[in-house]
Amino acid sequence: MSNCAGVIKSAIADGPGVRVSVFLSGCPHQCPGCFNSEAWDYDYGTPLTPEAIEKVQSLLDHSFIQGLTLLGGEPLAPQNVEASIRLATAAKRLEKDVWIYTGYTFEDLMALAFTSEQYRKILILCDVLVDGRFQQEQADKQLVFKGSANQRIIDIPASLEQKKLVLWEEPYAHH
């Protein structure tokens, strides 16, 4: 069973609108400069029991909450994919969007999805994927919704439909 390193009930930095952010414990990447290195340990935090997932669902069940963001640690580590699927499914049941921050690349995940039902499921449930390891030398506090310039903000439904990577564009951005 996966562990939860923490929950932010009304996050505003982890995607658009007001969101519920869930940090899953355990990370194989262990990026230097990570802002959440205590969550690298898979045993950190509290177990993500069915009751804990119900609690997250109740936090999501408010009209002012736009969506769920899954972070870590690494929410898409093999040990965490099942919990991420359960959390994302709870969000979708309430018609909330799902953002996932991962150190894996979109290309890595598409390759995994080719052979893994779990990775196919989580990609189908995901609206936006912020991919790539945090790279300290490319860190920039001015970046919106990502920590380092190498990371990409990907529109997953459009990418799956068009069979190519499609970057997410903020609906209200002025170009």
Where do the protein language model's features map onto the residues?
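Well-ordered beta-strand positions
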Residues: 127-128
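Conserved Radical SAM active-site core
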Residues: 2-5, 18, 36-121
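Short, conserved loop/helix-junction motifs that constitute active-site signature segments
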Residues: 120-124, 147
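P-loop/Walker A phosphate-binding loop and immediately adjacent motor/lid segment at beta-alpha junctions
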Residues: 79-84, 88-95, 99, 139-175
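N-terminal [4Fe-4S]-dependent radical SAM core
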Residues: 1-23, 32, 36-42, 165-175
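Glycine-rich nucleotide phosphate-binding loop and flanking beta-alpha elements
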Residues: 76, 136-137
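Structured loop/turn residues at beta-strand edges in well-structured enzyme cores
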Residues: 29, 63, 124
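Flexible glycine/acidic-rich beta-alpha junction loops that bind and position SAM and/or redox cofactors
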Residues: 13, 109-110, 137-146
